[in-house]
């Protein structure tokens, strides 16, 4: 009651207070989403470290089906072993499941989305969508890697200075990290002024999952085998990023119309330029 009359409760609201409350709520939800992404990745890593081939058929079976389709080879499942080729020369086992790539892709997509849209608010639906996209990308990348490995085995290919295990490791690094970069570029909008800097993000995620976690787990106690793996993983992805950054830089230098700094922020979508998306209401 004001001055003997009634005033609607909504007439006394404070826009500044409402904005602060809304921002605080948005930060809490963003923090919960970040924690969920990290916990999902850790849970999957723990599950994979103890899983058998029987427990990984959800990813081994579709991968093997795609490999059979593309390579013409046939495989049969053997309990607790994996999918054995008909000539018993190749097995798609637990280490071939691609779960580490799945974790890396999920982290890269999830963390990048959270960071990029941290001021706008993100619907929780981005989590299952990110997981589904990472799963599909894993099937494609893993199928490609296994088909290449089968072809290397069939042709008995050798590289001077590399053992069979080293060649297999190099092939896996190039295929997996190459697909990670491709996935990043297909899902990312990069500012025209900093397209090469953005490529450091997938590299950092890849290093964290392939080098950081093994170091924390004490894998370095294995001695020389671990440090050989460490050097391969450290050097070759960096080389791939440097090559891609060179070509991206060359493409931008060859297209001066992409330099739009004087016209405000724009985004670079696979060679196309558009204005940034309008801010979305929080959902």
Give residue ranges: language-model regions.
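Acidic/polar hotspots within intrinsically disordered regions
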Residues: 4, 11-13
